[in-house]
Amino acid sequence: MTDRYDAVLVGAGIMGATLAALLHELDPAMRLLMLERLDGPALESSAAANNAGTGHAANCELNYTPQQADGSVATAKALAINAAFERSLEFWATLRERGELDTPAFLNSVPHISFVWGQGDVAFLRQRHQQLSALPAFAGMEWSSDPAELAEWMPLVMQGRGASEPVAATRISRGTDVDFGSLTRLYLQDLQRSGALELRTGCEVNDLTRKSNGDWSVELAGGERVQTPFVFLGAGGGALPLLQRSTIPEAKAFAGFPVSGQWLVCGDNQLASRHLAKVYGKAKVGAPPMSVPHLDTRFINGERSLLFGPFAGFSTKFLKQGSLLDLPRSVRIGNLLPMLQVGAGNFPLVQYLINQLRQSPEQRLEALQQFLPQAEASDWTLSVAGQRVQIIKNGPKGGQLQLGTEVVAAADGSLAALLGASPGASTAVTTMLEVLERCFASRLATPAWQERLKALFPSWGGDVLSSRSRNTAVLGL
C-alpha cells in the first residue's frame, strides 16, 4: 500500500525546514514527509560554510541599493529585504519566548559594515547613508570617513592602510550572523520529536506524476512511491530539474544558470578573533550578487571564523554534490532559446566569470589585501563554497537572467518550488509565507489559521517594524 502524507517536502535545507515548521504551527495534525538525497540535513547551500551571505537585512549589501541616473540610490529592494529579515527575527523571537527554539545556537550579534574607498564610491556611500538613515528600517545606520573611528569599528581593515585615498564606511550595530545549517537542524529535531515530521535521508526523488484524484505520486529511487496533495520542491539547485519533471505549465518558462563560489578561510584563530563584523565592499560591474566581496565573521557550529570572498566560478553542476550533467539535462525545447539569449546578452557577467576562473592565488590575495592590507597568504586557505543556480526566465523580451529568488506554483496550489538565489535563507520565513498564501489560500483565510499567524507574528496584518524592539529584546540583539 502506498503511504500518503499531507505534504511532501523535497530537500532538507532551510527553506523546507521553515515551511515544515510553519505548517506544523498552523496545523499540528498535519503529517509531513521530508526527503533528502544526502546523508543529513543542511549539507548543501544551507550549511554555514556554503552560504554566500548570512543575516541579510540589506544593512550593508550595496548591490541592493543601485545608483540611479540622478545620483540617488534605489531603496525599494533594500526595504523589502530588511522587512523580510525582520519577519524571520519575529518568528524566531516567538519560538524563543515559548521555549521552542535555542536561538543562541544559531544567531549571533555581528555589526554590518559597508566599506568603500576612492572618491566616487565614497560619494555613493554618503548618498546611500543620507537616504537610508532617514528611513525607520535603517535609522540606526552610522557614517564615518574618519580613519581613527574606522579603526575602532574594524581594526584589521584599517591596520597598515595608506592615507593616499579617501575611505568611508557605514555601520549598523544590530547586525547578525545566522548559522542556517544549525537552525535547520533545530527545526527538524523539534518536528521529529513531535511526531509530525518523518525525515528520510539518502533518499532521492526520481519523478513526480499527477494522479486522477489530484494527488501527486512521488517516485523515490528504488521504485517506492508516496502520495500527497501537496509537494514543495526546496532542493536548492536541484529544484529546477524536479520542477521540470512535474510537467506543470508554469515550469516551461524557466531555465538555470549555475554559479559556483570559493572562500578564503582564515586559519589563524587569533587573527580571526580580532575582527567582529561583516564588512561588505562594492561589487565589480557584471558580478552576480553572491560575488559581492566581503570580509565575514561567521559562527560555524558554534566556532568563530573569518572568511573572505566569495570568488565566483562556473560549473555545470546545480548542487555542490551534484552532477556535471545537471545543466545539459535541464535543457528543453522551451528554454534553449532563452538560455542562449541570456548568454549573448550578459557579456559582462560571462567575462567576469572567466576572469574569476583565471585568478591565481596571488590575485586572490591582492583582492583580500584591499580589505586587509597586511594579509599574508600563509594565514588563508581556499575552500569551495556552495553552488547557486540563478533563474533564467522567458518573458516578452526573451530570456532574462533574474538575480533573486522566485516561488513557482501550480495554478491549483498543489505544488510549489523555490528557484534562484540571494538573499535566500535570510528571507526564508517571508518566502515560505508566500508559499502558504499561494498554495493554502483557503485555509490561510480561516479564523483558526489567522489566529495562529497573529500569535506567531505579533505584527501580522500591520507593519513588521512594530515588532522590532520586541524582537531585539527577546533575541538579545
Curated annotation (Swiss-Prot):
Keyword presence, Oxidoreductase: yes
Pathway linked to the protein: Carbohydrate metabolism; tricarboxylic acid cycle; oxaloacetate from (S)-malate (quinone route): step 1/1
MF (Gene Ontology): 2-hydroxyglutarate dehydrogenase activity; L-malate dehydrogenase (quinone) activity
Keywords associated with the record: FAD, Flavoprotein, Oxidoreductase, Tricarboxylic acid cycle
Keyword field contains Cytoplasm: no
Cofactor requirements of the protein: FAD
Residue ranges of the TM segments: none
HAMAP family: MQO
Family: Belongs to the MQO family.
Name assigned to this protein: Probable malate:quinone oxidoreductase
Gene this chain is encoded by: mqo
